[in-house]
């Protein structure tokens, strides 16, 4: 498990090498997982995205796009996350988000703050990963997904629990 301030992540924290095949092979509580156990996306032939991808889009644009740019494409001072997730697993992503990262050399100074105690990020970390993974694999285009699955009851329960709300 990964401890992050008052949060404990780990229900599906994996330690696979790289991103792997994003194809969903398992569903649990309305979420999809690949063969390595990484959270992943599901996009139907009509363009309907799963709830996690849609939620991830919303949460990414709430907390991450200021530095990493619209749709995970990067900015002048933060890398493109859509490219980063082509080779990284959920555990790699979670480690950087929870603990932050500092990459300093004579030519650059890139610092990402730790978000391990930010409930607006941590309660939706899998969703943010799923959205960015879908972008990295060109499964969703830029902009807000037009159609999405309904929010699963399990997602509401997990969200309320993480945010300290009553179910």
Question: Which stretches of residues belong to each language-model region?
Answer:
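Sequence context surrounding c-type heme c attachment/ligation sites in exported
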Residues: 54-65, 74, 88-94, 145-147
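Short, low-complexity, Pro/Ser/Thr/Gly-rich segments in the mature regions of secreted, periplasmic
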Residues: 149-167
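The canonical Cys-X-X-Cys-His
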Residues: 60-70, 93, 97, 112-113, ...
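Electrostatic cytochrome c docking/interface patches
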Residues: 18-59
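Bacterial N-terminal signal peptides
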Residues: 1-8
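Axial heme c-ligation environment in periplasmic c-type cytochrome domains
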Residues: 17-20, 75-82, 100-127, 132-152
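Solvent-exposed, acidic/flexible segments
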Residues: 49, 53, 57, 86, ...
